[in-house]
Structures are given as structure tokens and as C-alpha cells.
Amino acid sequence: MASAKEISQYLKRFSQLDAKRFAVVKVGGAVLRDDLDALTSSLSFLQEVGLTPIVLHGAGPQLDAELSAAGIEKHTINGLRVTSPEALAIVRKVFQASNLKLVEALQQNGARATSITGGVFEAEYLDRDIYGLVGEVKAVNLAPIEASLQAGSIPVITSLGETPSGQILNVNADFAANELVQELQPYKIIFLTGTGGLLDADGKLIDSINLSTEFDHLMQQPWINGGMRVKIEQIKDLLDRLPLESSVSITRPSDLAKELFTHKGSGTLVRRGERVLRATSWDELDLPRLKSLIESSFGRTLVPDYFDTTTLLRAYVSENYRAAVILTDEGQFGAGRLTYLDKFAVLDDAQGEGLGRAVWNVMREETPQLFWRSRHNNQVNIFYYAESDGCIKQEKWKVFWYGLENFEQIQHCVAHCATRQPTLLG
């Protein structure tokens, strides 16, 4: 799945969190129905490695089937299910059955899990005249969840709410998840779906979204349909009220471990992210912080005169100096000038966030052609292969490029890389 170092890095990061701040996992009813084995396997694995997720589930398809069997027509207003007293009795039964089905499956898989079908969401009627017995969450009681976590057991929660007087109300599972997340402020919010993530215009998985740099552009795309638009806006609203380090992952149950424990992931990772600063002079940057970023990223020391002897063309740096791209101008060749990628640095604790890609994407929008070199054992080479038009192997380096127009340009760039002096010691 990944290197032991990668897995260890993420496990250490997650293990340092307060138990209830690790992850909230939102499971749709379709996943419970169609992918229960993969779901229980993934959740059990997390418990085996010492992590306890908080699981909240829906039961939409199951509820549709039971209401239809009872002759109760489905009626929604503004996307919310109108709930009559007759329907509520079925809602309670279906939610409890779905909850117990997941808890029992986890227990049969060797995991410890606790059924929590009430007592978490205090609610009031959303609008009784319009929606019937539908609730709006007013408060979240963490006591049942904390008791489960302290016992080392996975809390499995339904989205049923209760009024202060004890009336059960049907609460939309997405709304309930949002309120739970606001109360817990978790590091990870995970939506498990059958599609395994958000898809672009070509049906290809979007692996990461950095909202600070990509949200406005994304919302302008014609292929962002109504449902996806609402989902992305909801995620942005959610993350805007959480700590900067919090993130949303959308993935399949079977890919949960890969999404959590590898840099590459397997799904769509959405973060509020950081703005990307653009500079054309070293004077515009905090050079001690930039030096620390580069040296930490490469595990080596910059030559002492790097900033004095390197003529900067453009630098792209995340606002907290956790990722950076440094470009230099290598002069005229043919009809245009050549741009060289001198450094691409990402801190260890930012790997897997999509922050490096976000900085790279901002750079690429303004840089139609580029060449660079990388050591043979550089783990980033997989990314470079995907981003380049070609690669030539030298004795010490791999030379990559994109946007170069002809063989003479490529030949010139390869020769330049062979003779360029290293700027990192050790």
C-alpha cells in the first residue's frame, strides 16, 4: 500500500490527537447496503492500529424501501423528507436496524463497537407545519460518545434527534454530521461513498482540492453540476469553521486506509488550505523561513550564498511556508526564454495534504514551459513523470520538461542540467 515510513508518519500524527478528535466517518445508507464487508474491515483495521473513529450513518435507501412497503409515499421539500407520525415509527425502526446491523458486523469482525441510537442530538422542530416530525439540531451531547471512546469502542450513531421533552425527530444525516463535527472539531471528516470521490468533467477522480486557491475557479467550471456544487459549498462552509489542519476525505470504504495512511491517498482530499504567495524578488520573502523549509524538505543544507547567487524569476510559497516552488530564468534560446525549476520543497507534515500540488498548480498556470532535474531516488519522481512531457536519464539525474518546442531546446536543457552546480550540501 505504501512505505512503512509513510504509514508510520501518519499513524504518529493521528495518535497524538485526543481520541475524539481523530475522525468522524459519515456512512450513507447505500454503503451500509452494498459495501458492508469493506466498511467493517476498514473500520476494524483502524481500531487494530489504535485509532477509534466516530461513525455516523444514514439509511436513505432502506427507509425508502420500508416506507414504500408500508404504502407511505415519499415526499420531500427542499431536499428534506417530510415525516408524519406514521413515517417516524418506520424511521426509528429502520435506523435502529441499520445501526445494529453495522455494530454486529463490526463485532463479528473482532472490533469493539457501541450502538448509540439516541441521546446525542438535542433538536427542535424545523417547521412542524411544513416538514412534520423533522428536527433541527440545537445541541450535541458528547457523553455517550466519550463513554464509548473511553471503553475503546467505536461509537456508531444514528441521526435521530430528541426534543427536551423527549419527542423523537427525524434529522437529516448530513446536517447531523455537520453539527457533530462542529462540536468535536476533528482532524479528519470522512465521507464514504460508492463513487470513491469527486469526479471531473472526464469522470476522472479529483485527488485533492485546496479551497484557498481553487474554489473560485472550480465553481466556474461548466461540468460542476448542481449536486456537486452544493457538496463542495457545504464542505467549504464546514471547513471554514474548523481548525486549518482539519480536512475532508471522500473515498470508498475499501480505500479508507489508503486515503488515511499514504501521501497519494485514494479519493478526494479537500482542505481549506493556504493562500499561495507569489514573489519576483528575494526581498519579498522571509528568507530564514524559506531556507528552513528547503533544508527540512530535502534533509540537506543550502549552500551559504544561495540567495545571493541565485537569480530569482518567480517563487510560489504557501502562506505558512510549508511548500514552495522556486524558478530561475536560464536565458534566451531560440524564440523564447527558458525557465528552470530550481527547488520544489514540501514539509513532511504537509505531505498528503495536497498543498504541494496546490502550489505547483498555481505555478503551472503562469509557466507554459519548464525544465528541471531530480535525483534518481527522489520519491517525488512519480509526480514529476505525471507532470512532464518527457524525461531523460543522466548518470546522477533525471531531467524532466514540459512545453519545450523542439529537440534543440530539449538537448540544450539536458546539457544545462548535466553541468549545473548543486546548491544543497550533503
UniProtKB/Swiss-Prot annotation:
Domain annotation N-acetyltransferase: ranges: 274-425
Binding site for substrate: A59, G60, R81, N170
Region annotation (Unknown) ranges: 253-426
Localization annotation: Cytoplasm
Coiled-coil spans in chain: none
Cytoplasm found in the keyword field: yes
Cellular compartments per GO CC: cytoplasm
UniProt pathway annotation: Amino-acid biosynthesis; L-arginine biosynthesis; N(2)-acetyl-L-ornithine from L-glutamate: step 2/4
NCBIfam families per the UniProt record, alphabetical: argB, PRK04531.1-1, PRK04531.1-2
Name of the protein in its database record: Acetylglutamate kinase
